[in-house]
Amino acid sequence: MDAAPPATPEELDAYERVIEEWLAAQLEENPSVEAFERDRDSGDRRWIVRVAGEEKAHFSVWFHLRQRTLHVETYVMPAPEENHAQFYEHLLRRNLNLGGFTFAIGAEDAIFLISQIPVGRITNDELDRLLGSTYAYVEQCFRPAMRIGFASRFKG
């Protein structure tokens, strides 16, 4: 990412409106989007989007508008119970083909999928790409990763 100056409060307000309008349209037009909510408690410009999946029945995608970037993340699964090396190798190899997204280890060693873009790239098309990619990558990776990291639960 380039070292663009931080967005002004007015620019952030404009990006916030783009995100809010896009989310409202997604709720109406995208059957995978079940709900969205603005996080008003934190004082940050953050939204949580509830998504219905197939491999993973439901998950939430966070959009966090910062001064220089829009950060996107979703919780994928807890830390593996077994086959740790194989599990993390699997996710690291998947990172090569995730088009600007990365699997990351978060609190309590949980697995998250994250991405970010410069605020100047926030458009409806880019928001579509971010949400669509999050959906696709969770759907592609969830079951194989679960079968590795929780293998004994899948026997029988």
What positions do the PLM features span?
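Short, charged/polar surface micro-motifs in flexible loops or helix N-caps
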Residues: G53-H58, L65-L70, M77-E81
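Short amphipathic alpha-helical signal-transduction/dimerization elements
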Residues: L96, Y135-M146
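A short, solvent-exposed beta-edge/loop patch
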Residues: A104-Y137
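Charge-rich, low-complexity N-terminal segments
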Residues: M1-K56, G106
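Short, internal acidic amphipathic alpha-helical interface segments
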Residues: L70-F112
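Short beta-strand-to-loop capping motifs
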Residues: V51, T74-V76, S115-V119
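Short, highly charged C-terminal tails/helix-capping segments
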Residues: M146-G156
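Short glycine/proline-enriched loop/turn "hinge" motifs that connect secondary-structure elements
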Residues: G53, W62-L65, T102-E108
